[in-house]
């Protein structure tokens, strides 16, 4: 008789990029991709893992891009935050269809649409086995959703921030442009800063470093990768002190 292996993490913060939701469409939300991600999250919940999620908004609007086009950066960032709420609602709906209880908590009050972010409520929901989707970034302009992921991860005392990307982890160079680039298995925060590796923006990364929040970068497009990460198997790149 085999005993079921236990997950390596009890509580995680999963950071998904908005682009991940668009699939091959190039814009918006691909329902097939959304449903697949919901199923992967469901697997974790069934393992007893507590899951917090932060989703970007780049598939709909990106504040920095709008600012480059001449829009006021604060207005652009507000639009970006609302895009993350739209993605969060879509993810909650996909989870509900997969029979997973989920709540969207927004850093910007949107009465009648989703709940306001509340730290104590979030912890309680997670303990009860519900997935909590943190929307609207940090609620402030000039902060990325990577910053929001690290902030919420630290607040809810997650064991790790899992950054889902389109590549297998952190490489010595851009693996798309350079096929010879090598994948790092483990890195320290100092390594990342000294080598100027693009893991996440500096504000987000230094926040994680200062609070000793481990970050694991992995490929969400790889079937079963999320489960393998949570089970403590070799997948992606782990960044720790």
From Swiss-Prot:
The catalysed reaction is: UMP + ATP = UDP + ADP
CDD domains from the entry? AAK_UMPK-PyrH-Ec
What's the Enzyme Commission number for this chain?
A: 2.7.4.22
Positions with a binding annotation for UMP: 57, 77, 138-145
What is the recorded function of this protein according to its Swiss-Prot or TrEMBL entry? Catalyzes the reversible phosphorylation of UMP to UDP.
What does the subunit comment say?
Answer: Homohexamer.
User: What protein name applies here?
Assistant: Uridylate kinase
Recorded source organism is Vibrio vulnificus (strain YJ016)
Q: What lineage does the source organism belong to?
A: Bacteria, Pseudomonadati, Pseudomonadota, Gammaproteobacteria, Vibrionales
Q: Which gene encodes it?
A: pyrH
